């Protein structure tokens, strides 16, 4: 089990003491360490029907979940056992054993209903365990399924607006398996041999008639058929005919159990291992251990506060928590990759921006992988701002590294020049020419220094600015120059200074243009990955709707075949409405891009510092500065 302990024994997940449910923090801590998707198998049934034995077999053990040896129900609340999946190494198998339903020692029968509802909400495969046969009495005992509409909400509504949204259950309910223990009948129907699945489906056929008695008898049948489209049945012979041995069945060697029971148990386990899927919420949200922990806590908190557990609220809680973590993961990835791939100072700004673009693309992908239900792209916008701030910090670090490196190199290269000035080497006739030659050599040597970075021209320009007064002093004292020559030299110096300043401004303009282009790439990358994610989500919704439609059409067909024409016709409106929703969803594809551009695009421009109009304003200011410099140069020439 990746990122989690291999549990040697079960722990209580939801405690049920004095008719109050409480989440066990120890179990939550175990779940929070499981990063793999979880296949959750929950078993529910009347007390003392051998549920725990089946769960122990799934765990590959004889012992673990408490079987008990008396008529008292041993399992209280919901117990959990997390084990490595025996055939899917990338998944963790989470087994949930629930306390027996219908225990006479319980006071409030609602307690059983909540346990039943929690088992449905948490599992990807729901096993209902009963004894002997699936008859009228067995279906009556499964009345808990008829109460699910009062115990579970798919969508968030206020109490005054509560509506029956059980139509949505099919999109997130688990697969349903009915296990019949100590099966006493032959699998035959009207003289022909049938499968256990056919036996179940025959038992779920509606009883003809519209009497109150028939409607009451049909209610659990209809609920199972409507809520659980994927159904399976397993029947088991008695493990042993020896009543005394039966009490201690967990201690019996497997080869001493009835052969048929051994085969049936292996078939059951094999089916679970091969066919049980990872726990998935609506729209394809796959649940790992950490998410399961949040779901358990959210549902139990809702029950204890007097509310009905709501899937939409639970998903919102999950999204708020995980999307914040997704932003942090993505931002950390960006920082780590930038630090690994860059050597400061970079030779050019473009070198840094190229690395930034690659790292940002990866960071956005990390966010998309770990986020879901990001309403209005709130968290993606946070990531955009965070990455922009980190990029600005790297730009500052790059500038500081370049400044420090260039200043150190220039100080070293100009040391001889400074010493010559101090010693008065240039205070002789022809000294101005000697000074210019010495300074030119410093500039040429500086030019050959590798990887000076983005502040190379700035440092050189500052150095040359510091030499203006020194050059003028040397020139004025040079007796080899006439007044006319001095005037010409002064004009040349001014022209060179203006050209250097112009060159610096051109560099700034070029760098600003590069930053703008990087912002545009950032915008396009965010939109592209968002579009891809939204398209995937749209397809998931469409797939769920099509599964729901297929399920409704099957129910309608079965109703018609069973002679319930009125019920069949009543479904026409539901089916028609669902078909319209599917068509609308298909048409959304063409407008998806425009929606992203209109919504998220505008926000990106406003939340990213220095983008959009700010870049345009910066370009105008720089352009104005360049024009002013050029005009000043023209005035000097005149």
From Swiss-Prot:
GO MF, any single term: GTPase activity
GO biological process: one example: adhesion of symbiont to host
Alphabetical list of Gene3D superfamilies matching this protein: Guanylate-binding protein, C-terminal domain, P-loop containing nucleotide triphosphate hydrolases
Source species: Mus musculus (Mouse)
Keywords: Antimicrobial, Antiviral defense, Cytoplasmic vesicle, GTP-binding, Hydrolase, Immunity, Innate immunity, Membrane, Nucleotide-binding
Similarity field: Belongs to the TRAFAC class dynamin-like GTPase superfamily. GB1/RHD3 GTPase family. GB1 subfamily.
InterPro entries on file: G_GB1_RHD3_dom, GBP_C, Guanylate-bd/ATL_C, Guanylate-bd_C_sf, Guanylate-bd_N, P-loop_NTPase
UniProt main location, coarse: membrane
Protein name (database record): Guanylate-binding protein 7
Catalytic activity from the UniProt record: GTP + H2O = GDP + phosphate + H(+); GDP + H2O = GMP + phosphate + H(+)
Subcellular compartments: Cytoplasmic vesicle membrane
Its biological purpose: Interferon (IFN)-inducible GTPase that plays important roles in innate immunity against a diverse range of bacterial, viral and protozoan pathogens. Hydrolyzes GTP to GMP in two consecutive cleavage reactions and predominantly uses GTP and not GDP or GMP as the substrate. Following infection, recruited to the pathogen-containing vacuoles or vacuole-escaped bacteria and acts as a positive regulator of inflammasome assembly by promoting the release of inflammasome ligands from bacteria. Acts by promoting lysis of pathogen-containing vacuoles, releasing pathogens into the cytosol.
C-terminal tail: annotated segments: 590-638
Region (Interaction with the CYBA-CYBB complex): 311-638
Record-listed E.C. numbers: 3.6.1.-, 3.6.5.-
Consequences of knocking out this gene: Mice show a dramatic susceptibility to T.gondii infection, resulting in rapid death of infected mice in the acute phase of infection. A significantly increased parasite load seen in the spleen, liver and the peritoneal fluid, with markedly elevated production of pro-inflammatory cytokines and development of severe ascites.
Assembly and binders: Monomer and dimer. Interacts with CYBA, CYBA-CYBB complex and ATG4B. Interacts (via GB1/RHD3-type G domain) with NCF2 and NCF2-NCF4 complex.
Enzyme class: hydrolase
Induction info: By IFNG/IFN-gamma and IFNB1/IFN-beta. Up-regulated upon infection by T.gondii or L.monocytogenes. Up-regulated in response to influenza virus A infection.
A GO cellular-component term linked to this record: cytoplasmic vesicle membrane
Binding positions for GTP per the UniProt entry: 45-52, 67-69, 97-101
GTPase domain (Globular): annotated segments: 1-310
GB1/RHD3-type G domain residues: 35-277
Activity control summary: Inhibited by orthovanadate, berylium fluoride and aluminum flouride.
Consequence of changing residue 52 to N: Loss of catalytic activity and localization to cytoplasmic vesicle
């Amino acid at each position: 089990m990746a990122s989690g302990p291999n549990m040697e024994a079960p722990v209580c997940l939801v405690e049920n003491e004095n008719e109050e449910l409480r989440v066990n923090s120890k179990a939550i801590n175990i779940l929070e360490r499981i990063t793999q998707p979880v296949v959750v198998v929950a078993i529910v049934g009347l007390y003392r029907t051998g549920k725990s034995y089946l769960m122990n077999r799934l765990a590959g053990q004889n012992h673990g979940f408490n079987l008990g040896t008396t008529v008292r129900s041993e399992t209280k609340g919901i117990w959990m056992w997390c084990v490595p999946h025996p055939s899917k190494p990338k998944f963790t198998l989470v087994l949930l054993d629930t306390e027996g339903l219908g225990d006479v020692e319980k006071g409030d029968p609602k307690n059983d209903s909540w346990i039943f509802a929690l088992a449905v909400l948490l599992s990807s495969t729901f096993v209902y365990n009963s004894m002997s046969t699936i008859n009228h009495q067995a279906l009556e005992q499964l009345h808990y399924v008829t109460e699910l509409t009062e115990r579970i909400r798919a969508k968030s509504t206020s109490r005054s607006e509560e509506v029956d949204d059980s139509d949505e259950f099919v999109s997130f309910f688990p697969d349903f398996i009915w296990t019949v223990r100590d099966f006493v009948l032959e699998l035959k129907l009207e003289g022909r041999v049938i499968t256990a699945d056919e036996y179940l489906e025959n038992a779920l056929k509606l009883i003809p008639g519209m009497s109150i008695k028939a409607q009451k008898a049909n209610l659990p049948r209809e609920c199972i058929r409507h809520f659980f489209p994927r159904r399976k049945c397993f029947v088991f012979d008695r493990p042993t005919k020896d009543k005394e041995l039966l009490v201690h069945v967990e201690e019996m060697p497997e080869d001493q159990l009835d052969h048929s029971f051994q085969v049936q148990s292996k078939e059951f386990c094999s089916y679970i291992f091969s066919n049980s899927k990872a726990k998935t919420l609506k729209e394809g949200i796959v649940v790992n251990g950490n998410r399961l922990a949040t779901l358990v806590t959210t549902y139990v908190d809702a029950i204890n506060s007097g509310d009905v557990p709501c899937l939409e609220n639970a998903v919102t809680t999950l999204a708020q928590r995980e999307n914040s973590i997704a932003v942090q993961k993505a931002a950390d990835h960006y920082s780590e990759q930038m630090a690994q791939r860059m050597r400061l100072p970079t030779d050019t700004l473009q070198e840094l921006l190229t690395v930034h673009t690659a790292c940002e693309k990866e960071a956005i992908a990390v966010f998309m992988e770990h986020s879901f239900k990001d309403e209005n792209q709130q968290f993606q916008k946070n990531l955009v701002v965070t990455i922009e701030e980190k990029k600005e910090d790297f730009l500052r670090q790059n500038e500081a590294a370049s400044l420090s490196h260039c200043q150190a190199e220039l100080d070293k290269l100009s040391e001889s020049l400074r010493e010559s000035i101090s010693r008065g080497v240039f205070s002789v006739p022809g000294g101005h020419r000697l000074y210019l030659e010495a300074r030119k050599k410093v500039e040429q040597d500086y030019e050959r220094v590798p990887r000076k970075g983005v502040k190379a021209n700035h440092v050189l320009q500052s150095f040359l600015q510091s030499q203006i007064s020194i050059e003028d002093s040397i020139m004025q004292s040079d007796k080899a120059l006439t007044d006319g020559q001095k005037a010409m030299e002064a004009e040349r110096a001014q022209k060179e200074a203006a050209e250097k300043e112009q060159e610096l401004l051109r560099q700034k303009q070029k760098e600003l243009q590069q930053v703008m282009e990087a912002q545009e790439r950032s915008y396009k990358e965010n939109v592209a990955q968002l579009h891809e994610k939204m398209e995937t989500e749209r397809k998931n919704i469409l797939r769920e709707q099509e599964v729901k439609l297929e399920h409704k059409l099957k129910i309608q067909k079965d109703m018609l075949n069973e002679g319930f024409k009125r019920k069949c016709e009543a479904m026409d409106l539901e089916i028609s409405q669902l078909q319209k929703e599917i068509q609308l969803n298909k048409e959304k594809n063409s407008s998806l891009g425009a929606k992203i551009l209109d919504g998220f695009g505008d926000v990106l421009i406003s939340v990213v510092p220095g983008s959009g109009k700010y870049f345009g304003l910066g370009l105008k200011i720089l352009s104005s500065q360049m024009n002013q410099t050029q005009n000043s140069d023209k005035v000097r020439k005149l």
